[in-house]
A protein has these predicted regions:
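Acidic-basic catalytic patches of nuclease active cores, encompassing PD-(D/E)XK
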Residues: 1-34
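Well-ordered, non-membrane alpha-helical segments in soluble/globular domains
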Residues: 9-12, 61-71, 99-101
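Hydrophobic beta-strand residues in large extracellular and virion-surface proteins
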Residues: 14, 25, 38-39, 86, ...
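Active-site beta-strand-loop-beta-strand hairpin of nuclease catalytic cores
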Residues: 36-50, 76-79
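Short beta-strand-loop-alpha-helix junction that forms the active-site gateway
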Residues: 47-65, 90
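Arginine/glycine-rich "motif VI" loop of SF2 helicases in the C-terminal RecA-like domain
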Residues: 72-81, 105-108
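Acidic beta-strand-to-loop metal/phosphate-binding motif
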Residues: 81-89
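Domain-level recognition of nuclease-like catalytic cores that cleave nucleotide substrates
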Residues: 90-136
Length: 136
């Protein structure tokens, strides 16, 4: 996946969210494929959390669907589910929720370990001109 400014913003905000929840330790990546964008471990409980970012354009891609399915089905050695956080723009949250139901990742009885984190996308900032530059 490309590292567009939107995706970088989503990733930073999702990492901040995981840190607030106590998943502050960066886990060493293993040689499993595919590799999640974010892997964190709670230093207190030792629980693993995965994180992925999803853009509007990703919602229709088969590769995104496969990644979401793969990471939502991952288990620890002791067969407990791994928490999975998906960072998405606020405007795209309903579409992602519908996709998760369509892929049978979340429903009324399953998918409690999959958490959608809506993130406000920042507006593009304009560079201010100083009074000196305006005078020419």
């Amino acid at each position: 996946m490309s590292d567009s400014p939107e995706r970088l913003h989503l990733r930073r905000q999702l990492e901040a969210h995981l840190t607030e929840l106590g998943y502050s330790c960066v886990r060493m990546k293993r040689a499993t494929l595919p590799v999640p964008e974010i892997v964190r471990v709670s230093p207190v409980r030792g629980r693993i959390a995965y994180g992925e970012t999803v853009l509007r354009s990703d919602l229709r891609r088969r590769s995104c669907h496969e990644r979401l399915l793969f990471f939502s089905q991952r288990r620890t050695r002791h067969r407990s589910s791994i928490l999975f956080f998906i960072g998405v723009g606020e405007a795209d949250e309903p579409e992602l929720e519908a996709l998760l139901e369509q892929l049978d990742i979340r429903s009324g009885t399953r998918g409690g370990h999959v958490h959608v984190v809506p993130i406000a996308l920042s507006a593009p900032t304009r560079r201010r001109t100083s009074p000196r530059e305006a005078r020419g």
